[in-house]
């Protein structure tokens, strides 16, 4: 009898921890990922954000490099996959399709070469939700999400969220981010089985207002209130926050195709990785450019012409760009041109260059490639030293 009791006790001692581990694996901590588009540290420090301040003090906080080019697709997809562009395949908002030799927006999920966090979660039986202000985010990386919503998505105007919070606001507004937050909050409250909620706001306010302007402060104060509501709605959840890029005022734009042509060093095409369908944000102009040559023999002459332009800070060969920024060589130009803090590149209708107005703001350069990163209440998170880049924010989850 004593032997039987001892055997039972030993079995319980061995089996209970395994059962607890199995339960932990089956039901990991709920997680909220917030990607605040365009949220440089200057915006954070200029605004009253007490809830975010509290997360900073209670968790991990640091300013980290984002990825180049400093545009949304490159960084959002890297955050969602936990992989660099040479592994996930996304090198901009647009690319030159080698099959058609035409510039095309990067929206097709077939271009994605690495699994997303939604796919990783699904393999572990975890339900997920993706809420984004931008349809391209849903199209590109939301395929495996169980719940997905954007204001331009089919059915959004007739969705339960629209009935509860009104019709989706215009994408060129502050309110569109609030609408997305309300939908995410409602989901957290009514669908506790959803283990991962990913929220992506818009950078329209940052393109429109500088950090010190009242409208910018108002927008971020509203976002901070929503962060507080997220904590209240899911006090058990880990909250992971970062950004894709910052923003700066830009005063000069070069049309590199026209500039090279007028200097007798014509090129095939120059593509701004920042260009997307949200033309009102930035007019398709950004602080970096992929330049494709007509002939490889033109490389030295074209590089010389580009380096001589005011505001051009660096001209890298494809090999240099791939090595320095971990880019996929098949989806970038023969050259990568980088602007200084005040210079952007894009297509201009008439002249080869244009002086930009005092309110024009954009990104894409190294000067927008540092962002805040917050990790709060994440029970299984790595130590602070792990988070060397923004794309590592959630790379450790569901592995």
Regions found by a protein language model. Name each.
Residues 1-4:
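Positively charged n-region of N-terminal signal peptides that target proteins for export
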Residues 6-15:
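Bacterial N-terminal signal peptides
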Residues 20-22:
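Boundary at the C-terminal end of the N-terminal hydrophobic targeting segment
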Residues 33, 51, 219-266, 337:
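Metal-dependent active-site segment of extracytoplasmic phospho-/sulfohydrolases and closely related
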Residues 39-40, 202, 209, 245-247:
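Catalytic metal-binding/acid-base residues of hydrolase active sites
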Residues 44-87:
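Short, structured active-site-proximal loop/turn typified by the sulfatase FGly-forming signature C/S-X-P-X-R
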Residues 84-210, 298-301, 307-311, 394-398:
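His/Asp/Glu-rich, glycine-adjacent segments
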Residues 275-399:
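Active-site neighborhoods of enzymes that stabilize oxyanions during catalysis
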